[in-house]
Amino acid sequence: TAMTRLTEERPGWYEGELDFKRVVLVPSTGKYEYRDTHFVVHCKAMSGQDCYDRMIDNLSERVDRRSQFPSPKGKNFRFRYLGRWK
């Protein structure tokens, strides 16, 4: 199942892709809006879930806290195992 694949421990490099709603300021109006944002990363992780957690931790420090992140189980998060680290 997708949940089993997400939590299966395979230490190594992962490519994670995340589509999320990012809050950004529109300079002309001074108001904020949600923008669809695609984020791709290569990271060392223990599982697909760990890859997701690392991505969210990284983004949470860099984007407006009102941004909306999808569930790791949904269609807006994808990952693939790239291989063991050396």
Positions of PLM-derived features:
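Short aromatic-glycine-(Arg/Gly/Cys) micro-motifs in beta-strand/loop hairpins
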Residues: 8-37
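Generic structural motif
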Residues: 21-23, 46-48, 84
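Short intrinsically disordered terminal tails
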Residues: 1-9, 82-86
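A short, exposed loop/beta-hairpin motif centered on an aromatic-Gly-Thr core
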Residues: 33-50
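N-terminal non-cleavable signal-anchor helices
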Residues: 24-27, 41-42, 57, 64
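Short, mixed-charge low-complexity intrinsically disordered segments
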Residues: 57-86
